[in-house]
């Protein structure tokens, strides 16, 4: 088999994994230091799954790297909480720990950036007794899924205050970021260089709300509506909910269905409106659609929480696919969310 055909089977993430596995630990750490937690997690997954890589593939990847060495590649997303686990599977516990330590202690990671590598509960503990505005800045700085998990470790009153503050954030002055980094760097190494940073806002609040459990999301939205009805409307307009899947194009729905198990799909559709059901049926084979209809009819009563859980699972998959460019989503107000 030719080198080109071998390399053609590799994704960009696979090639990145091969490249890093070919480097020494120190050099790999230098490369990974310039990636975010999600990028490292995805490369770590690829490294863990590498089996029987041909010498020709390694040579081809190296050759391509030399040709495009000046380019930057965005590697997509994954779950932050599993980074250490995935790197351990890929490299072994000692090497994974050394690699992560080098990334975090290498001198280019700010205190805020270090929080992205921590478990959500640990982040919540770090900021629990800080001023509410500091809590809001930290939550706005995190990726929406991690931010939502951090919020879940606070009581409702604190969650409401943080989300309202995130919604009103626009830009953060360098002096404020520098002070916050200094506070955090008492525990984490890094530098405190800062530029005027855009973070927060209604869109960020909506993104975070999207990742909250349904019960927390509903309670929080009700409270926001009581405080500021106009703001709650703006947030809702930018949120993406299950019924919005009816507006996703056919190719996107087909791609999404390939990633969703039939059991989860049946549960999710039990609580959906007719438009989303027809959208799903339309994008399945005739036989598969008939089987799904039969499963829906045969399915007995289910708890609302089970339906909401299944819908959240599908939405999580959809958002991940949107962030990697596989599908395009739109919020209630039709604004594009990539």
From Swiss-Prot:
Residue ranges of the motif Part of the EHPQR-motif: 130-133
Site (Part of the EHPQR-motif): 165
Disulfide bonds: none
Main location, first listed in the record: membrane
SUPFAM superfamilies assigned: FliG (SSF48029)
GO MF annotation: an example: cytoskeletal motor activity
GO biological process: bacterial-type flagellum-dependent cell motility; chemotaxis
Membrane topology: Peripheral membrane protein
GO CC list: bacterial-type flagellum basal body; plasma membrane
Domain of life: Bacteria
UniProt xrefs under InterPro entries: Flg_Motor_Flig, Flg_Motor_Flig_C, FliG_a-hlx, FliG_M, FliG_N
Keyword Protease: no
Keywords: Bacterial flagellum, Cell inner membrane, Cell membrane, Chemotaxis, Flagellar rotation, Membrane
Record has Cell inner membrane as a keyword: yes
Subcellular location: Cell inner membrane; Bacterial flagellum basal body
PANTHER family on file: FLAGELLAR MOTOR SWITCH PROTEIN FLIG (PTHR30534:SF0)
Assigned protein family: Belongs to the FliG family.
The protein's role, per its UniProt record: FliG is one of three proteins (FliG, FliN, FliM) that forms the rotor-mounted switch complex (C ring), located at the base of the basal body. This complex interacts with the CheY and CheZ chemotaxis proteins, in addition to contacting components of the motor that determine the direction of flagellar rotation.
Protein name according to UniProt: Flagellar motor switch protein FliG
């Amino acid at each position: 088999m030719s080198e080109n055909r071998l390399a053609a089977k590799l994704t960009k993430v696979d090639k990145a994994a091969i490249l890093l596995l070919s480097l020494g630990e120190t050099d790999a750490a230098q490369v990974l230091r310039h990636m975010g937690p999600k990028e490292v997690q995805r490369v770590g997954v690829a490294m863990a799954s590498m089996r029987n890589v041909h010498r020709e593939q390694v040579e081809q990847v190296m050759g391509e790297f030399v040709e495009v060495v000046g380019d930057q590649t965005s590697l997509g997303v994954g779950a932050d909480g599993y980074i250490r686990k995935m790197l351990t599977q890929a490299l072994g516990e000692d090497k994974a720990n050394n690699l992560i330590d080098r990334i975090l202690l290498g001198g280019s990671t700010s205190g805020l950036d270090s929080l992205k590598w921590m478990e959500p509960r640990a982040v919540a503990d770090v900021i629990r007794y800080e001023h509410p505005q500091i809590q809001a800045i930290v939550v706005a700085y995190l990726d929406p899924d991690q931010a939502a998990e951090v919020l879940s470790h606070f009581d409702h009153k604190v969650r409401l205050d943080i989300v309202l503050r995130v919604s009103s954030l626009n830009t953060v002055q360098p002096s404020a970021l520098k002070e916050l980094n200094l506070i955090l760097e008492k525990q984490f190494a890094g530098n405190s260089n800062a530029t005027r940073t855009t973070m927060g806002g209604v869109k960020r609040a909506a993104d975070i709300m999207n990742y909250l459990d349904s019960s927390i999301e509903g309670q929080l939205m009700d409270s926001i509506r009581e405080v500021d009805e106009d703001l709650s409307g703006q947030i809702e307009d930018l949120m993406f909910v299950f019924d919005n899947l009816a507006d996703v194009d056919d190719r996107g729905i087909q791609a999404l269905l390939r990633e969703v198990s039939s059991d989860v799909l049946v549960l999710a559709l039990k609580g959906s409106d007719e438009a989303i059901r027809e959208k799903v049926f339309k994008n399945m084979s005739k036989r598969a659609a008939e089987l799904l209809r039969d499963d829906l009819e045969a399915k007995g009563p289910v708890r609302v929480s089970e339906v909401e859980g299944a819908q959240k699972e599908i939405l999580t998959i959809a958002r991940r696919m949107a962030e990697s460019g596989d599908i395009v989503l739109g919020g209630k107000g039709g604004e594009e969310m990539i």
